[in-house]
Regions:
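C-terminal beta-strand-rich structural cap/linker in extracellular carbohydrate-active enzymes
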Residues: 468-480
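N-terminal catalytic cores of secreted or lumenal carbohydrate-active enzymes
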Residues: 38-213, 236, 240
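Glycoside hydrolase catalytic-domain groove-lining segments
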Residues: 142-147, 151-153, 244, 252-255, ...
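Structural recognition of the beta-strand scaffold that forms the well-ordered cores
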Residues: 69-77, 108-114, 118, 165-169, ...
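Carbohydrate-binding surface patches
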Residues: 408-412, 422-460, 467, 471
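Active-site cleft segment of glycoside hydrolase catalytic domains centered on the general acid/base Glu
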Residues: 172-276, 295-304
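Bacterial Sec-dependent N-terminal signal peptides
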Residues: 1-25
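Aromatic/acidic polysaccharide-binding cleft in carbohydrate-active enzymes
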Residues: 313-405, 421-424
């Protein structure tokens, strides 16, 4: 009798364990037009599937796509200048909100720049060696980057709160390396060895400061926007100069091809470099910018042609100079604007992007300050939209809709996560899923409609029923 009772108890216990395991409790995090801001909620659990009129999606974690490298924005002088205007404790609070993976967004992929660009506003236009003809880099200096508003300082302060991959492109080399800064901004090939030396010195000087640049991108928006070097010459510089120089240097930095301003331009010009095996062997990542806000198919095609190379979307923003209509007031404070950016992030991820990096992380209430150097393509005015707005008069810190939508990805889809197959579609409602390094499932659910939407998320024969608030992003997490 005792044995029979024990057997019944054991069977019941096992059944309870099975039922509990199959329930798969879900944690939900919501940001919405109604006022939720990464708000934690119980998401219920996966249950037996039932027919309903809800929008339906299905997750298949047996089908894997790209590995995620990270999400973030750019570290530039203008942002640190604005941040430094706050009391020190509040400065640290802002940095924590951006980089701390537990208490903040956990930004995990960041961009900086080699010297001058349009938001290096702590001084006049500069490079690291502005002494004409100094091919041996005897006057090379990163002194400005070490100042209170400098990029090296910014990077160090950010890394107090979290780790992140760091990539760095260059708008222009020193003017004396160009044929003519006013009339022909192409690089004179006789300076290719000196330019390779310039890149290496930058990496070495930053390493001496405890900062290893993970990826160096030869040029930022070359040929059509900044340095007017054609891709045929970028191929030569990469293949015959910079690639071999970096290989001999002992540095662990890897190379990115260069960063086209638009997806369409990337699709058109990148094969000039990548179809040369001797040049391609030095390329670790294919970066591109998103200023056309379309042509995602061109990135999908690059992914099909060069499947072994990760794709990074490394710059995008609202900017009048980049085509944002003047009827839109910049910067944008409305939370609802985040929906636009959430869709852009999903679009890039769907065509294979492994990282997504916005341009200015912090700016003031005027969308600045910006640097002015017309000859280098830095106009005045140049208002842009950041992730975080800090009012220089009131000292109010405003976290934009972009901040929250981007945070749903950076906080929950950590580096090493893999995007998995998610099917189902409905106008204005989207879903995308990932499996993390720890084996946790993450689903991002976006509702772009102006009314609440019921949704079902299917997984391994079960179904999760959730209510998606109007204009919202919801992150669901559960154990596999």
């Amino acid at each position: 009798m005792r044995h029979a009772q024990f057997a019944r108890i054991l069977i019941i216990a096992c059944l309870l364990i099975v039922v509990n395991a199959s329930a798969q409790n879900v944690q939900l995090y919501v940001s919405s037009q109604a006022g939720d801001r990464l708000t934690a909620r119980s998401g219920g659990s996966f249950q037996e599937k039932q027919a309903s009129g809800a929008v339906s999606f299905e997750v298949d974690d047996s089908v894997h796509y790209q590995t995620i490298d990270g999400f973030g924005a750019s570290l530039l002088e203008s942002g640190l200048m604005v941040l430094n205007a706050l009391p020190r404790e509040r400065q640290e609070n802002v940095l924590q909100s951006l980089f701390d993976p537990k208490e903040g967004s956990g930004f995990s992929a960041m961009k900086t720049e080699l010297a001058g660009t349009d938001f290096q506003a702590a001084g006049p236009w500069y490079t690291y060696d502005d002494i004409p003809g100094d091919v041996e880099m005897k006057h090379f200096s990163i002194a400005r980057d070490l100042g209170p508003n400098g990029m090296a300082t910014y990077i160090k302060r950010a890394r107090k709160y979290g780790s992140f991959a760091l990539q760095a492109p260059m708008d222009y080399p020193p003017d004396w390396m160009l044929f003519d800064v006013n009339n022909n901004q192409d690089v004179n090939p006789k300076y290719f060895p000196a330019l390779a030396r310039y890149y290496i010195r930058y990496l070495e000087e930053y390493k001496r400061e405890g900062i290893e640049i993970d990826y160096l991108s030869l040029f930022n928006e070359p040929f059509s926007v900044y340095t007017k070097i054609p891709y045929e010459k970028i191929r030569v510089l990469l293949r015959d100069h910079m690639g071999p120089a970096l290989a001999k240097s002992g540095l662990r930095t890897k190379l990115m091809l260069s960063e086209a301003p638009e997806r369409g331009e990337a699709g058109r010009y990148y094969p000039i470099v990548l179809n040369d095996p001797a040049a391609r062997k030095y390329v670790a990542v294919i970066p591109y910018h998103g200023y056309d806000f379309k042509n995602y198919d061109k990135i999908a095609e690059l992914h099909r042609r060069y499947p072994s190379l990760p794709l990074w979307m490394t710059e995008i923003c609202y900017a009048y100079e980049a085509g944002t209509p003047r009827s839109m007031s910049l910067p944008v404070y409305e939370f609802s604007d985040g929906d636009f950016w959430g869709n852009v992030i999903m679009n890039d991820l769907e065509v294979g992007a492994s990282a997504w990096i916005y341009w200015n992380m912090i700016l003031d209430e005027k969308g600045g300050p910006w640097a002015i150097s017309v000859v280098h393509g830095n106009p005045d005015p140049n208002e842009q939209h950041p992730v975080v707005i800090i009012n220089q008069q009131t000292k109010k810190v405003s976290y934009t809709g972009l901040y929250y939508y981007l945070s749903h990805f950076s906080k929950f889809v950590r580096p090493g996560a893999v995007r998995v197959k998610t099917t189902g579609s409905s106008d204005g409602v989207r879903a995308m899923s990932f499996v993390t390094v720890q084996g946790t499932m993450v689903a991002q659910l976006m509702n772009s409609r102006k009314q609440d939407v019921e949704a079902n998320l299917g997984y391994r024969g079960k179904q999760l029923h959730v209510m998606l608030p109007a204009l919202s992003i919801s992150t669901a997490t559960w154990s596999r």
